[in-house]
């Protein structure tokens, strides 16, 4: 985060929810990232994400001793868009594999998958534990509606599909989990 108003809000929210931030990397330059989410009346969404100073995170800035205390590392595929964070992500994945820390990755956005598919696949040469994506991201990643290829890259895959059931792929098994009906509420 940056030392700006958004950074203060994020840090305060994390503290309020008992999340340790003593090793949070804070930049005195630039802006904290943000995301604009637009929701349509049928509860679909589209996002416009700006990574801000997080796109400059270098592996040398990360306290891996603290990371190694975690059970799981969660990353968004958005980090593939910056040379610094792309390199950091590759090194984190390697270090987590070596330390037996589970790895979860969200494919983030169909445009990210389309533009950086080969890089994302290279990150998962050694299988990650959990892959999260929506139907469009999965189709883009596999170049088809057949998602079994995803098993090459992750042990457990969760594919959301709007109001349709979420598909869960594990080794040789496939499950469907129905979505709960909910009403979209505009909180602005």
Which residues fall in each region the model found?
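Substrate-binding N-lobe of the ribokinase-like
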Residues: 1-34, 41-42, 51, 64
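Short gly/ser/thr-rich secondary-structure transition/capping motifs
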Residues: 18, 52-59, 110-115, 141
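Hydrophobic beta-strand scaffold residues
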Residues: 21, 103-104, 157
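Short beta-strand scaffold segments in enzyme catalytic cores
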Residues: 34-38, 46, 165-169
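Short amphipathic alpha-helix with an adjacent loop that forms part of the alpha/beta core around
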Residues: 59-68, 148-149
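Alpha-helix C-terminal capping/helix-to-coil transition sites in glycosyltransferase folds
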Residues: 68-69, 126-127, 153
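Conserved beta-alpha-beta core of the PfkB/ribokinase-like small-molecule kinase fold
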Residues: 72-148, 164-166
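Conserved phosphate-binding/catalytic region of the ribokinase-like
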Residues: 94-95, 143-188
């Amino acid at each position: 985060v940056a030392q700006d108003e958004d950074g203060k809000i994020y840090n305060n929210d994390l503290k309020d929810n008992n999340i340790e931030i003593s090793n949070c990397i804070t930049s005195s330059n630039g802006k904290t990232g943000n995301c604009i989410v637009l929701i349509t009346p049928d509860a679909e969404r589209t996002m416009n994400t700006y990574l801000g100073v997080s796109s400059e995170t270098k592996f040398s800035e990360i306290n891996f001793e603290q990371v190694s205390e975690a059970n799981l590392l969660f990353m968004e595929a958005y980090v593939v868009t910056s040379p610094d964070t792309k390199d950091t992500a590759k090194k984190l994945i390697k270090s987590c594999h070596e330390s037996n820390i589970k790895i979860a990755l969200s494919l983030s956005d169909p445009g990210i998958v389309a533009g950086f598919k080969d890089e994302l696949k290279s990150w998962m040469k050694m299988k990650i534990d959990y892959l999260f994506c929506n139907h469009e991201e999965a189709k883009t990643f596999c170049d088809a509606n057949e998602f079994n290829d995803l098993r090459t890259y992750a042990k457990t895959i969760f594919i959301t599909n709007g109001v349709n059931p979420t598909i869960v792929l594990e080794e040789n098994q496939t499950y469907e989990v129905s979505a709960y009906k909910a009403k979209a509420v505009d909180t602005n």
